[in-house]
Each structure stands twice: as structure tokens, then as C-alpha cells.
């Protein structure tokens, strides 16, 4: 033993430092699980969160023991009845295009896929208002998602131009004399053709008075930022319907996204045979099992529970002190600490319905609404904060959870892998094909899909966030009381059409602007 120690004692300080450095480099390789906070098993020793345990144990047990009647299943999966409204954009015929365009309009769109989608609709409307030619919008790289996908990477450009050819002039790129008008050009100084001061929800008159004169003087104007830069009210009916025509008819995803989406939908509707429908099962039981499972049907759950959402909410998600510190640091870095919710307690936020539903809570909601554990449930999400440990309770309630990676091969996903906007586009496409859609928290994707599905009269469940926040805070409720409260609180939140009110978004409520009452 002394002979083994002697060489170490003879090492000088620099040699010891080098040896320690090698050990630090090798440590993660020798013990990788300690550095894998998003692994399927558990958080790491150096994770920023602790594995959350179920917050609602009694409700969870009640959900696992629940009995769901066939009648309840049939009602749940039945399509919406005709509500007396139909899309109007197809019957709309705008005024013919003037012979001459006033010039070119460029817009630069930030945000995620659905915020950019709304910006594209607004850009077409603004171009129509000013009688200018729209250059295909430039999609900025989002600071959170880090996706550099362009318009043509996501949307079918030929279809877009064809659908709108009688409404607005659209060009793929600027003529050579305006080739200087680029993002880099506007990033390096003050430019006369750049409009940085477009107010949020600007009126049509604002564009005619402030942007059109620049286009008439220089032949072009670039508006950036442009997100949410057109009002929802006091616009001509033709402009409102044009926005919906862009949103619901002109914006088709590129073929490879649609093909992948169709493949996923087919696999969701036609799962492999399982033991539950094989063997010597009694024919009556076999029929009941098929009915209970909603044969050939599936629901999509948009589970927006990424770090960005968790941090911005200011809520506590049972990840311990490490998680609280990590989310506080994230708020400081991203928003310089200016997050309104951070001044309230967790209980106050939950009572006001301001906390996004955790995977556990959305699982309990689905169970109370009558979804059985046989439900084919497609999970539309980018990345769940807390990884598999956070989803484990939801998976316990619904073993049939699927997502892109479980349904498709690596080869099939190659064109979208690592590209947040393309992955979101696939989720959007699958969501539009589902029998039922439900989102765990408000947001742009929730709003966009709620509107699109309302436009087509498809069933969409809108969680009552205030009610749910209050019942989850109330630890005295048993399962039957919780189930009753949830059912009563969601009777009129399963796709019933709601008319847009003043100042509300046309991209959330398409009626009555884009829909007509059927006589």
C-alpha cells in the first residue's frame, strides 16, 4: 500500500492539477446518468429540478378506479351537432385588383409558428389595404426555439400564391433594383424605408397615413416588428374575411409535412392488434371494449409545459428549491425579472386560473371528462419541462399515449427533427385531423387550433382554468365531487361556437366575421 502511495506523493502541483482535470472530463462519461436531467428514469444529481411526486394522490387513485359507461363514451366521441354556421370566405369575392401596385411591402415576423401564421394573415390584409405587392414574409429565428425555417420550408408557396392571386399581388423575392432591402441592411443603421414604430393593433388608417407614403416615395417599406400590428375591429368586412381566407385556405403545409401527418393519423386510427381484442373474449365484451376504446378515434392533447411556460407562469410545480431557483434565474435572464405573476403566491395564481395544468392535472381532467384508459391520445408538445418523470402520472392514467417519435421512424422524422417550427406544423396538422382536441394551457397554438376547429365545427375542449385551479387547490374533494365539478364546469366548453367580442382576436374567434348564419 505504501508503494502505491509513493508515486502520488512525488507528483508536483501541475501534475496533480492535470490529473484532476482528466478526472473531471471522464466523470460524465463514466457516470452519464448523473448528468441527464431529461432522461426517462429520474433527474440527475446535478439537475435543476427534483422528480415531482403526484400532488393529488386521492384523486389519482379515484381516476385509476373509475368506471366509465358506454353511454358516456358514445357521447364523448360523438361529433358536434350542426350549430347553424358555415364558413363564408369561399363565397366572398373582393374587388378586382387595380392595374398598378403602389410598391412593395416587406414584413419580418418573430415568435413561434402560430404567431408567425397570424402575422402572415395580417401582412396579406395590410397589403390589400394599401394596394401594394407583398414580398413573401421573412420568418425570424425565435430566441427560445432557435429554428431558422423559412416560409417555404413550412408552407406550400405555390398554393399560397394561387389561392390569393385575385386578392393581393405576391412575389417570391424583390426585383433586382430593391435587392438591397434585406434584414442585414436594416440591422446596421437607421433606414428611411424601415418602419419600427407600427403600434400594436394599428388601424387601417395608420398604414395609409404612415406606411403608404414611404412606399410611394421609395418603392418599398419594411415593417419590423410586425407581430400583432393590425387591429381586430373597425375594418371592412372584406379585409376580415380575407384574413380568414389566408388562415384557413391559403396556408397549407408543404407536402412532406402533410404526408408525415397523414401517416401518423393513420397509425393512430389503426393501432396494432392487442390482447384486449384477441383470444376467447366473449363477443359482447369484445363490442363493449371496442366502444369504450373509441374504435378508430383519437384525441390530441397539446401539452404546453416547457421551461418557458413554467417560468413565465410564476407557479410552483413541486420541483423543490432547485426548480424554484432555476425558474427564477430563467425569468431574470429572459425577461429581466419583469414577470407580473411572480408577485403572487402559488395559491393565489391557482385560484385565478393562471397556472398551466401539469401533466398530472390534465390527466385527471381527461379522466373526469370520461376519457377511458384505452384512449388513443396523441401528445403534441415540443419538450416537457421535467422530462419523462413529469409525464409518468399522465402515462399511468393513459398508457396509450403516442407522439411523433413513438409513431414514426427516425427516417420518417429526418426532415423535421431538430426544427421546432416543422415539428409544431406536424402537430398542428394531426390536431386538425383528430376527433377531439384539448390544450393544457392558453397560448398561440391553443388559440389557432380553437379557431380553425371552430371554423370547421370540430369538437374542442377548452379547460376552465379558474375552476380547475380552485378544485386542485381544494384538497378535501373526493373523486366523485371532483368529477362532478369538472363535468358541470365543462358542459358548454366542448366546441360550442362563441362569437367574437370587441377587441377579441379573429384568430381565436372566427365568427361572425368569417362565418355566415345558415338560414
Swiss-Prot record:
GO cellular component terms?
Golgi cis cisterna; membrane
Q: How does it sit in the membrane?
A: Single-pass type II membrane protein
- Leading EC class: transferase
GO BP terms: fucose metabolic process
Q: Which residues form the signal peptide?
A: none
In its keyword annotation, does this UniProt entry include Metal-binding?
no
Q: Where in the cell is it found?
A: Membrane
Give the EC number(s) under which this enzyme is classified: 2.4.1.-
Q: In which pathway does it act?
A: Glycan metabolism
What positions does the record give for glycosylation? Answer: 131, 373, 474
Q: What is its main location?
A: membrane
The protein's matches in PANTHER family, at most eight in alphabetical order, are given as: O-FUCOSYLTRANSFERASE 2-RELATED, O-FUCOSYLTRANSFERASE 31
**This protein is called what?**
O-fucosyltransferase 31
Amino acid at each position: 500500500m505504501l508503494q502505491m502511495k509513493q508515486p502520488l506523493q512525488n507528483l508536483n502541483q501541475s501534475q496533480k492539477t492535470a490529473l484532476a482535470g482528466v478526472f473531471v472530463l471522464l466523470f460524465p462519461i463514466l457516470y452519464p446518468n448523473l448528468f441527464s436531467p431529461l432522461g426517462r428514469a429520474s433527474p440527475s444529481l446535478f439537475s435543476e429540478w427534483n422528480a415531482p411526486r403526484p400532488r393529488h394522490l386521492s384523486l389519482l387513485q379515484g381516476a385509476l378506479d373509475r368506471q366509465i359507461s358506454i353511454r358516456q363514451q358514445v357521447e364523448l366521441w360523438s361529433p358536434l351537432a350542426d350549430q347553424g354556421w358555415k364558413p363564408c370566405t369561399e363565397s366572398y369575392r373582393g374587388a378586382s385588383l387595380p392595374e398598378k401596385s403602389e410598391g412593395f411591402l416587406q414584413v419580418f415576423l418573430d415568435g413561434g409558428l402560430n404567431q408567425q401564421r397570424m402575422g402572415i394573415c395580417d401582412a396579406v390584409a395590410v397589403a390589400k389595404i394599401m394596394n401594394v405587392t407583398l414580398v413573401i414574409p421573412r420568418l425570424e429565428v425565435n430566441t427560445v426555439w432557435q429554428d431558422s425555417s423559412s416560409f417555404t420550408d413550412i408552407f406550400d408557396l405555390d398554393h399560397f400564391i394561387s389561392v390569393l392571386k385575385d386578392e393581393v399581388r405576391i412575389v417570391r423575392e424583390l426585383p433586382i433594383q430593391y435587392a438591397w432591402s434585406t434584414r442585414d441592411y436594416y440591422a446596421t443603421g437607421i433606414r428611411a424605408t424601415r418602419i419600427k414604430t407600427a403600434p400594436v393593433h394599428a388601424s387601417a388608417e395608420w398604414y395609409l397615413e404612415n406606411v403608404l407614403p414611404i412606399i410611394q416615395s421609395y418603392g418599398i417599406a419594411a415593417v419590423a416588428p410586425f407581430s400583432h400590428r393590425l387591429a381586430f375591429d373597425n375594418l371592412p368586412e372584406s379585409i376580415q374575411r380575407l384574413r380568414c381566407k389566408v388562415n384557413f385556405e391559403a396556408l397549407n403545409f408543404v407536402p412532406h409535412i402533410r404526408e408525415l401527418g397523414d401517416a401518423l393519423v393513420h397509425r393512430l386510427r389503426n393501432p396494432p392488434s392487442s390482447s384486449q381484442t384477441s383470444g376467447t373474449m366473449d363477443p359482447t365484451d369484445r363490442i363493449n371494449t371496442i366502444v369504450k376504446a373509441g374504435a378508430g378515434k383519437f384525441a390530441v392533447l397539446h401539452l404546453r409545459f416547457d421551461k418557458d411556460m413554467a417560468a413565465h407562469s410564476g407557479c410552483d410545480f413541486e420541483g423543490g428549491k432547485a426548480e424554484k431557483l432555476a425558474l427564477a434565474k430563467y425569468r431574470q435572464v429572459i425577461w429581466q425579472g419583469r414577470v407580473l405573476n411572480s408577485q403572487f403566491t402559488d395559491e393565489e395564481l391557482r385560484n385565478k386560473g393562471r397556472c398551466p395544468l401539469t401533466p398530472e392535472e390534465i390527466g385527471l381532467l381527461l379522466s373526469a371528462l370520461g376519457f377511458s384508459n384505452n384512449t388513443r391520445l396523441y401528445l403534441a408538445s415540443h419538450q416537457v419541462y421535467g422530462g419523462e418523470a413529469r409525464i409518468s402520472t399522465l402515462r399511468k392514467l393513459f398508457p396509450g399515449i403516442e407522439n411523433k417519435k413513438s409513431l414514426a421512424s427516425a427516417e420518417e422524422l429526418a426532415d423535421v427533427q431538430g426544427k421546432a417550427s416543422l415539428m409544431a406544423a406536424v402537430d398542428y396538422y394531426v390536431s386538425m385531423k383528430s376527433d377531439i382536441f384539448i390544450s393544457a394551457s392558453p397560448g398561440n397554438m391553443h388559440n389557432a387550433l380553437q379557431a380553425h376547429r371552430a371554423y370547421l365545427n370540430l369538437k374542442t375542449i377548452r379547460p376552465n382554468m379558474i375552476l380547475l385551479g380552485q378544485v386542485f387547490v381544494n384538497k378535501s374533494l373526493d373523486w366523485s365531487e371532483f368529477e362532478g365539478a369538472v363535468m358541470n364546469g365543462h358542459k358548454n366548453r366542448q366546441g360550442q361556437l362563441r362569437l367574437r367580442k370587441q377587441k377579441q382576436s379573429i384568430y381565436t374567434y372566427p365568427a361572425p366575421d368569417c362565418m355566415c348564419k345558415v338560414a
